[in-house]
C-alpha cells in the first residue's frame, strides 16, 4: 500500500542530521504556510503566505547531496535518481514560470555556503510508510531555503527511482519546499494514498492554482474564476480549517481551507461548471508529530486549530450530489456568498480510501468480471470508455473499507444493491462497485461520492477514464546508428520512452497503429554495461508496466571505459563576474539537452551549456555579487553518468574595476534570439572606459560597433550576414582591460507561426480553446528545409514545456505543417506556443488551453 507523510521547515544544508532536526512544524488544500499578520484571534484577517522573495523571473535552484542514498534497489543508480529529481524540478518550472524558475543545480558537498535562496535534496533513513519529507525554512514569511528529504534506501518506500511513484513523490516534496501544503483533491500535493498523478499529468488544477497564488504574474487570476463564502455550524459558530472544494463533475477539482472566522476563497478555478462541497479534515491530517498539515498562526505565533468534525455537504447543504447546485465559473469573475451550514459529527464516515482496477493481461483493458480471467491489479483505477460496464474496487489504505449505502459517479450513475458488493481478503474488506456508462463518454479523471446513513465521503479523481488499452512493449532492438527501436502495442504520438526513469529523445515519428507500432529513440547517455529498464508512458497516464507479469524489458549499454573529467578551463571567478568554462572528459556520451553542469552553490549560476562533442562541453557561468568567497564542488551529469570534483571551483573577492559581460541580446527587443545580419547588444559594467578604443571580437573576427552604441553599460555591434550559426567566443576589451570571454549562441533566423488549428482544421482562438490530448497543427513559414530530414532539431513548446511532435509535412504556399500532441491541461490559461529550431524560437503564439 502507498502512504506518504511529510514535514516541513528544514534549515540550510548541514546535511542530513541537521535538516532532520530543523524539520519542525509543517500547512493550506491548495494551502500554503499561512500567517495571519492582523486580526488577532477573531478577524477580519490579513493573510500572508511563506514564499521565496525573488525578483520576477528569478530562479530557485535545488542541489542534491553528493552522498546519495546508502542502499540502491537492484538495477537502480544515482544517475537514475538524479534524473527523477531533475524531471520533478522541470515539472514545477513548467507551471511556475515565468515569474519563478525552478532548476536543478547539480551536486553539493556538506556544509556548502550560499547567500542565494534555493533548495537541498538529501537522503535519510525514513520510518516505514514514509516516502519523503519536504518543506521550507523561513525567516518570518520569507522562505530562505527549501529542503527535500528522500529515502536513503531506494529498495524501500517509493521504490526504485526509475518507477513512476518515485517521480510523483519527488514532485510532491519539491512542492512543499516551494511553499505548498497538502490538499485532498487527488492532485500532486495530495498525500500519496490520495494522489492520482503520473508522468504524463504531474499536476492538476489545484496545484497550478496553489503555485500561482504564491508566484503567479500580475493579473494571472484574470484567466481563472473564484468562489468565496463562509462555513458555519448550525449555532452560527465559525468552522476553521474546513476544506471547500470546487469540483467539475468530469473535470478539475480546486480547493482551499477556511480561515479561523469560517470564511474562504478559492482562486485559480478554470472556467466551467462546478459543484461545491465542504468536508472536514481527515483524522490523520494534523498528527501530533507534525508530519502533516502545519497549522496557521496569528501575529503572536499562536496556532489556530481545526474546529472539529462535521458532516460533508454539497452546496446548498445537501448530501445528495444530484441536488447540488451547479455553478458557472467564468474567467475574471468571483462568485460570492456561497455559504454552508454544517452539522457536528463524532467522526468521519471514511478517509484514506484508494481505488483499483483489474486489467486483462491479454487485452490490457479493465475487466468487468474476474471469473476465470488472468488479471493485473492497478492503483489507482482505470476504466476504458469503449466499454459499457465499469468495475472499480474501493478499499481502505489500512483495514476495512466502511460500507456505504450507494456510490455515485459525478456526471454518471449510482451503484447500489447488487452493483455494490463486499469483497473480503487478507488485506481487509473492500467494495466492488459496478457502473454502466455510455461508450465514448469522454476521458480524464472521474470522481466518486460514497453515501452513508447521515454523511457522505467524496473521492476526487477516484479513477481515470481512457480511450485505449495500456501500452505493452514486445521488443527493444538496437540499431546500427546507436538508436533503439521499441516495438509494441497501443503506442501513439503521445507515447514517451524512458530508460531507467530518464526520457529518451525521439529520433523519428511514431510508426504503426494501435495493434503494432514502433518508436525509435536515442537512449540517454549511460555507463558501459548498464542494464536499463525500458518503459513506455502514454499521455493518458497509462504505462507499459500496467499489465506486465514480468519485469520491464531491458537495454544493455555497450561496454566502455570509466568516465572522468579531464580538464576545466576556468576554476575561479570573482564575485559579480561572468565567464566561460570549457570542459573535456573521457568515456562520456553527451547529448544536447540532457547535460547538467553544477558548481555546488546557488551563488554560481550556469547560464547555458553547449554540447560540442561526446566529451566536450562549454558553458557560461556567473557569480552573484554578494557570493561567499570559498570553494565548491563541480559536477557534470549526463544521462546516468555522474562526474564530480569537490573543492574545485573558487569564488574570489569582488574586483570592482573588472569589465563584466552580464548579458547579450538582440538589439531589437522584439526578437528573442541573435542571428546573422542583426545588431547585438552587450550589457554589463565597465564595458567602455575608453569608448574609442573598445574592441569586440566574435569567433576571433573583429566586429563593427554601432555608431553611438558604445557606452559604459552597453556596447552594440553588428553580426555579419554570413556569420556561421552555432556558439562563438565573444571577447570585449574596454580600452584598458579585457573582460572574461563568454560563449554566444548565433542562431538561424527563427520560423514564423502563421496559424494554429485542431485536427479538423478549425483555428484556435478564445472561443475555440485547445484541450489536453488534442492533436494540434501549427503552420509555419521560413523553416529551414533540412529540418524535415532531421525532425529532432525541432521542438514545440507550450508555456515552455516541450510537447511530443508527431510529424513535419510540407504544406501549401511554402508553409510547413508541424503536428504535435497536447499532453497536459493548463486550466484555461492563455499560454505561449512556440516552434523552436536549433534553439531559435519563433515569436510566441497565444493559445488558450483548457
What are these regions (language model features)?
Residues 272-278, 446, 632, 728, ...:
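A short tyrosine-centered beta-strand micro-motif
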Residues 27-350:
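Zinc-dependent metalloendopeptidases
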Residues 270, 439-443, 523-530, 625-629, ...:
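Surface-exposed, short loops/turns at beta-strand junctions within beta-sandwich domains
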Residues 229, 258-270, 274, 278, ...:
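Glycine-centered loop-to-beta-strand initiation motif
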Residues 14-22:
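Bacterial N-terminal signal peptides
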Residues 362-383, 388-395, 401-405, 466-469, ...:
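A sequence-level detector for low-complexity, Ser/Thr- and acidic-rich stretches
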Residues 242-247, 276, 407, 496-497, ...:
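Hydrophobic beta-strand segments
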